[in-house]
Amino acid sequence: MSFIDSLSPQNVIPVEEIRYDERGLVPAIVQDYLDGTVLMMAWMNRESLQKTLDTGETWFWSRSRQEFWHKGGTSGHTQKVQSIRYDCDSDALLVGVEQIGDIACHTGERSCFHQVEGKIVAPPGDTLSQVFQVICDRRNHPTESSYTSKLFAGGDNKILKKIGEESAEVVMACKDDDQEAIAGEVADLLYHTLVALAHHQVDIKAVYRKLQERRR
Protein backbone atom coordinates (compact mmCIF):
# COMPACT_ATOMS: atom_id res chain seq x y z
CA MET A 1 0.00 0.00 0.00
CA SER A 2 1.34 3.45 -0.87
CA PHE A 3 1.39 6.33 1.62
CA ILE A 4 -1.44 8.04 -0.24
CA ASP A 5 -3.57 4.88 -0.05
CA SER A 6 -3.37 5.05 3.75
CA LEU A 7 -4.94 8.52 3.82
CA SER A 8 -8.63 9.18 4.05
CA PRO A 9 -10.01 11.05 0.99
CA GLN A 10 -10.31 14.35 2.85
CA ASN A 11 -6.65 14.19 3.91
CA VAL A 12 -5.06 13.55 0.51
CA ILE A 13 -2.55 16.28 -0.35
CA PRO A 14 -3.92 18.36 -3.28
CA VAL A 15 -0.79 18.20 -5.44
CA GLU A 16 -2.20 20.53 -8.08
CA GLU A 17 -3.42 23.05 -5.50
CA ILE A 18 0.01 23.60 -3.95
CA ARG A 19 1.40 27.02 -4.92
CA TYR A 20 4.70 26.32 -6.65
CA ASP A 21 7.10 29.16 -7.44
CA GLU A 22 8.07 30.37 -10.92
CA ARG A 23 10.45 27.40 -11.19
CA GLY A 24 7.68 24.96 -10.34
CA LEU A 25 9.16 24.27 -6.90
CA VAL A 26 7.94 24.33 -3.30
CA PRO A 27 10.15 24.20 -0.18
CA ALA A 28 9.75 21.05 1.91
CA ILE A 29 10.84 21.16 5.55
CA VAL A 30 11.47 17.66 6.90
CA GLN A 31 11.18 16.88 10.61
CA ASP A 32 11.27 13.81 12.82
CA TYR A 33 7.63 12.87 13.29
CA LEU A 34 8.19 11.69 16.86
CA ASP A 35 10.28 14.39 18.55
CA GLY A 36 9.83 17.27 16.10
CA THR A 37 13.53 17.80 15.33
CA VAL A 38 13.97 19.71 12.06
CA LEU A 39 16.12 17.42 9.91
CA MET A 40 16.54 19.20 6.58
CA MET A 41 15.02 21.41 3.92
CA ALA A 42 14.86 20.55 0.22
CA TRP A 43 12.76 21.33 -2.84
CA MET A 44 9.89 19.42 -4.39
CA ASN A 45 8.00 19.86 -7.64
CA ARG A 46 4.67 18.31 -8.61
CA GLU A 47 6.28 15.09 -9.78
CA SER A 48 8.54 14.58 -6.76
CA LEU A 49 5.66 15.31 -4.38
CA GLN A 50 3.56 12.74 -6.23
CA LYS A 51 6.43 10.22 -6.05
CA THR A 52 6.67 10.88 -2.32
CA LEU A 53 2.96 10.22 -1.91
CA ASP A 54 3.06 7.09 -4.07
CA THR A 55 6.12 5.49 -2.46
CA GLY A 56 5.86 6.67 1.14
CA GLU A 57 9.48 7.85 1.03
CA THR A 58 10.79 11.35 0.34
CA TRP A 59 11.70 12.38 -3.20
CA PHE A 60 13.05 15.81 -4.03
CA TRP A 61 14.11 17.86 -7.05
CA SER A 62 17.79 18.78 -7.33
CA ARG A 63 18.15 22.32 -8.65
CA SER A 64 21.85 21.86 -9.43
CA ARG A 65 21.56 18.49 -11.19
CA GLN A 66 18.10 19.11 -12.59
CA GLU A 67 16.91 15.64 -11.64
CA PHE A 68 14.90 13.77 -9.02
CA TRP A 69 16.71 12.41 -5.99
CA HIS A 70 15.48 9.77 -3.61
CA LYS A 71 16.60 10.70 -0.11
CA GLY A 72 18.80 7.90 1.23
CA GLY A 73 18.73 6.01 -2.05
CA THR A 74 22.52 5.65 -1.93
CA SER A 75 23.32 5.86 1.80
CA GLY A 76 20.35 3.80 2.97
CA HIS A 77 19.21 6.68 5.21
CA THR A 78 15.76 6.85 3.68
CA GLN A 79 12.85 8.76 5.16
CA LYS A 80 9.56 6.97 5.78
CA VAL A 81 6.80 9.54 5.41
CA GLN A 82 4.32 9.69 8.28
CA SER A 83 2.56 12.96 7.49
CA ILE A 84 2.61 15.88 5.08
CA ARG A 85 1.20 19.29 5.97
CA TYR A 86 1.06 22.47 3.94
CA ASP A 87 0.86 26.00 5.29
CA CYS A 88 -1.98 28.51 5.15
CA ASP A 89 -0.72 29.92 1.83
CA SER A 90 -0.21 26.44 0.34
CA ASP A 91 3.35 27.39 -0.64
CA ALA A 92 5.42 25.38 1.85
CA LEU A 93 5.36 21.75 2.99
CA LEU A 94 6.10 20.22 6.39
CA VAL A 95 6.96 16.53 6.05
CA GLY A 96 6.98 14.32 9.15
CA VAL A 97 9.23 11.30 8.69
CA GLU A 98 10.82 8.35 10.38
CA GLN A 99 14.50 8.89 9.62
CA ILE A 100 16.15 5.54 8.94
CA GLY A 101 19.60 5.38 10.53
CA ASP A 102 18.79 8.60 12.44
CA ILE A 103 21.06 10.50 10.01
CA ALA A 104 19.60 13.07 7.62
CA CYS A 105 22.66 15.19 6.78
CA HIS A 106 25.35 14.22 4.27
CA THR A 107 27.93 15.24 6.89
CA GLY A 108 26.83 12.37 9.11
CA GLU A 109 24.95 14.61 11.54
CA ARG A 110 21.40 13.78 12.49
CA SER A 111 20.13 17.16 11.28
CA CYS A 112 21.37 19.51 8.57
CA PHE A 113 20.65 22.33 11.03
CA HIS A 114 23.50 21.49 13.39
CA GLN A 115 25.53 24.71 13.22
CA VAL A 116 25.06 28.07 14.89
CA GLU A 117 27.58 30.76 13.89
CA GLY A 118 29.96 28.02 12.83
CA LYS A 119 29.78 26.00 16.05
CA ILE A 120 28.31 22.50 16.02
CA VAL A 121 25.51 22.17 18.55
CA ALA A 122 22.70 19.75 19.19
CA PRO A 123 19.81 20.26 16.75
CA PRO A 124 16.69 21.88 18.17
CA GLY A 125 14.21 19.21 19.13
CA ASP A 126 12.34 17.55 21.93
CA THR A 127 13.82 18.19 25.39
CA LEU A 128 13.27 14.61 26.54
CA SER A 129 15.15 13.31 23.52
CA GLN A 130 18.08 15.62 24.23
CA VAL A 131 18.17 14.61 27.90
CA PHE A 132 18.03 10.96 26.86
CA GLN A 133 21.00 11.49 24.52
CA VAL A 134 23.02 12.94 27.42
CA ILE A 135 22.03 9.99 29.63
CA CYS A 136 23.15 7.52 26.96
CA ASP A 137 26.44 9.38 26.66
CA ARG A 138 26.98 9.03 30.42
CA ARG A 139 26.27 5.31 30.07
CA ASN A 140 28.72 4.90 27.21
CA HIS A 141 31.39 7.24 28.61
CA PRO A 142 31.12 7.06 32.41
CA THR A 143 32.92 9.54 34.65
CA GLU A 144 33.48 9.39 38.40
CA SER A 145 31.87 12.78 38.97
CA SER A 146 28.65 12.00 37.07
CA TYR A 147 25.57 11.13 39.12
CA THR A 148 24.09 9.43 36.07
CA SER A 149 27.19 7.26 35.62
CA LYS A 150 26.92 6.22 39.27
CA LEU A 151 23.32 5.14 38.70
CA PHE A 152 24.41 2.93 35.81
CA ALA A 153 27.20 1.48 37.94
CA GLY A 154 24.62 0.54 40.58
CA GLY A 155 22.53 -1.34 38.03
CA ASP A 156 18.84 -2.15 38.37
CA ASN A 157 18.87 -2.16 42.17
CA LYS A 158 20.02 1.46 42.41
CA ILE A 159 18.03 2.74 39.43
CA LEU A 160 14.75 1.07 40.37
CA LYS A 161 15.11 2.14 43.99
CA LYS A 162 15.34 5.75 42.83
CA ILE A 163 12.29 5.34 40.59
CA GLY A 164 10.35 4.02 43.58
CA GLU A 165 11.47 6.93 45.75
CA GLU A 166 10.66 9.53 43.10
CA SER A 167 7.24 7.96 42.45
CA ALA A 168 6.39 8.30 46.13
CA GLU A 169 7.51 11.93 46.11
CA VAL A 170 5.28 12.64 43.11
CA VAL A 171 2.34 11.18 45.03
CA MET A 172 3.11 13.31 48.09
CA ALA A 173 3.49 16.49 46.03
CA CYS A 174 0.13 15.83 44.38
CA LYS A 175 -1.48 15.17 47.75
CA ASP A 176 -0.17 18.56 48.91
CA ASP A 177 -1.42 20.18 45.68
CA ASP A 178 1.93 21.98 45.37
CA GLN A 179 2.27 22.79 41.67
CA GLU A 180 5.95 23.73 41.77
CA ALA A 181 6.81 20.61 43.76
CA ILE A 182 4.73 18.46 41.40
CA ALA A 183 6.64 19.78 38.38
CA GLY A 184 9.99 19.19 40.08
CA GLU A 185 9.19 15.69 41.31
CA VAL A 186 7.74 14.61 37.96
CA ALA A 187 10.91 15.91 36.29
CA ASP A 188 12.99 13.79 38.68
CA LEU A 189 10.81 10.75 38.02
CA LEU A 190 11.06 11.21 34.25
CA TYR A 191 14.83 11.56 34.48
CA HIS A 192 15.30 8.34 36.46
CA THR A 193 12.86 6.54 34.16
CA LEU A 194 14.98 7.61 31.19
CA VAL A 195 18.01 6.16 32.96
CA ALA A 196 16.14 2.86 33.28
CA LEU A 197 15.32 2.96 29.56
CA ALA A 198 18.96 3.52 28.66
CA HIS A 199 20.11 0.81 31.08
CA HIS A 200 17.86 -1.70 29.33
CA GLN A 201 18.79 -0.48 25.82
CA VAL A 202 15.27 0.81 25.06
CA ASP A 203 15.28 3.86 22.78
CA ILE A 204 13.03 6.71 23.85
CA LYS A 205 11.45 6.67 20.39
CA ALA A 206 9.92 3.31 21.27
CA VAL A 207 8.09 5.12 24.07
CA TYR A 208 7.01 7.89 21.70
CA ARG A 209 5.54 5.27 19.37
CA LYS A 210 3.57 3.72 22.24
CA LEU A 211 2.24 7.15 23.18
CA GLN A 212 1.23 7.74 19.56
CA GLU A 213 -0.72 4.47 19.64
CA ARG A 214 -2.47 5.39 22.88
CA ARG A 215 -3.77 8.73 21.64
CA ARG A 216 -5.68 7.22 18.73
UniProtKB/Swiss-Prot annotation:
GO terms for biological process: L-histidine biosynthetic process. The keyword Kinase does not apply. One of its GO terms (cellular component) is cytoplasm. The keyword Amino-acid biosynthesis applies. It is found in: Cytoplasm. Its main location: cytoplasm. Residues 128-216 are annotated as: Phosphoribosyl-ATP pyrophosphohydrolase. One of its GO terms (molecular function) is phosphoribosyl-ATP diphosphatase activity. Its EC number is 3.5.4.19, 3.6.1.31. Pathway: Amino-acid biosynthesis; L-histidine biosynthesis; L-histidine from 5-phospho-alpha-D-ribose 1-diphosphate: step 2/9; Amino-acid biosynthesis; L-histidine biosynthesis; L-histidine from 5-phospho-alpha-D-ribose 1-diphosphate: step 3/9. It catalyses: 1-(5-phospho-beta-D-ribosyl)-ATP + H2O = 1-(5-phospho-beta-D-ribosyl)-5'-AMP + diphosphate + H(+); 1-(5-phospho-beta-D-ribosyl)-5'-AMP + H2O = 1-(5-phospho-beta-D-ribosyl)-5-[(5-phospho-beta-D-ribosylamino)methylideneamino]imidazole-4-carboxamide. Residues 1-127 are annotated as: Phosphoribosyl-AMP cyclohydrolase. InterPro entries: His_synth_HisIE, HisE, PRA-CH, PRib-ATP_PPHydrolase-like, PRib_AMP_CycHydrolase_dom, PRib_AMP_CycHydrolase_sf. Disulfide bonds: none annotated. Keywords: Amino-acid biosynthesis, ATP-binding, Cytoplasm, Histidine biosynthesis, Hydrolase, Multifunctional enzyme, Nucleotide-binding. It comes from the Bacteria. In the N-terminal section; belongs to the PRA-CH family. This is Histidine biosynthesis bifunctional protein HisIE. The lineage of its organism: Bacteria, Bacillati, Cyanobacteriota, Cyanophyceae, Nostocales. The gene is hisI.
